[in-house]
Amino acid sequence: APDVDDIDIMPLGYATFLYDDAGNQIRKLAAPDSNRLPVTLDQIPVDLQHAVVAIEDERFYEHNGIDVKGILRAGMKALTTGDFSEGASTITQQLLKNNVFTNWTSESTQLERFTRKIQEQYLAVQVEKKTDKDTILENYLNTINLGAGSYGVQAAARQYFDKDIWDLNLSECATLAGITQAPTKYNPCLLYTSPSPRDRG
């Protein structure tokens, strides 16, 4: 595993904006995985923070980086049903996967995946010894893939609702939180279309 002192849990890149002489935005440039707009935790609605934690890592504020109960639950399910799809990754592990183990999408064997997961678990514990939960959650919310090329909650709020993250209502916060489970499948642009004339009455 990488040395914990050498790892960086900060997001890897951000979008760049070009403006004309009058200050109007004329172009947005973003490399793959870099369409993110950083925000601080206090700018993110508490409802969204709570919803993401409830969906992604319900024991986030209780564990030390790894969720032993979640690991045991996923292990029992795998042994009894043969279904290895249930994950037990914590928010801290997911943050490491996205910002440190960036080649995880090219893993081709169970051994590669298992090796990476063990390293993630080790580093998650080390990171939580030196980093507070709020910093971890803030970086996670600025990093998470929310579909349609949006990484982080501010980019997603702009993409889906044409709003800043702090202006989202409860329903919009719930929608963003729900995307985390399957960013392509739950893309609101694909799920919600204009009502038909019949629907409009």
Please give the residue ranges for each predicted region.
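N-terminal post-signal-peptidase region of extra-cytosolic proteins
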Residues: 3-4, 33-41
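Extracytoplasmic
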Residues: 11-14, 21, 34-36, 47-49, ...
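Acidic/histidine-rich, surface-exposed loop or edge segments in extracytoplasmic proteins
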Residues: 28-36, 53, 182-184
